[in-house]
Curated annotation (Swiss-Prot):
Cellular compartments per GO CC: cytoplasm; cytosol
Bridged cysteine pairs (disulfide): none
Name of the gene encoding the protein in the UniProt record: yeiP
Listed HAMAP family: EFP
Top-level taxon of the source organism: Bacteria
GO biological process: peptide biosynthetic process
Organism whose genome encodes this protein: Salmonella typhimurium (strain LT2 / SGSC1412 / ATCC 700720)
Protein name: Elongation factor P-like protein
Amino acid sequence: MPRANEIKKGMVLNYNGKLLIVKDIDIQSPTARGAATLYKMRFSDVRTGLKVEERFKGDDIVDTVTLSRRGVDFSYVDGNEYVFMDKEDYTPYTFTKDQIEEELLFMPEGGMPDMQVLTWDGQLLALELPQTVDLEIVETAPGIKGASASARNKPATLSTGLVIQVPEYLSAGEKIRIHIEERRYMGRAD
């Protein structure tokens, strides 16, 4: 079993009889000698969908669950439900808008390549996105000539409604690459 300091975002833990998906991890390093680093983890309970927050010391042993991953393509929206189709056997997987609210901020209208669903014991748990996505800037302050030398940023609204900080020289209509987990600008898209 792994230690708390080996846990990554997207892993699933069996903790206090609950299946919890790791949504976010904050690492708090103490300044006092001999004090242990604390890992504050935010989870989503698989069965109830409730948000759960727990703290662990770096050397605490945690029980992880092995999941099965299936490649999927976005198929269609049916009211409040989003349907994804298995790439191999065409099994439909349905999520409510609330279940994948975060992921929808990064998903272009027609879906994106390399998406996976996580299942455990036949139960649908989560939708996993690739590390990066290319999106178009739909609204931002106009680009400033000669701004490439400065490292200042400005907010930009992307085609999915997500707002991130981008360099000043970018303008509306440009496609950019975003690191999904860190919600940050990586560069212009190819």
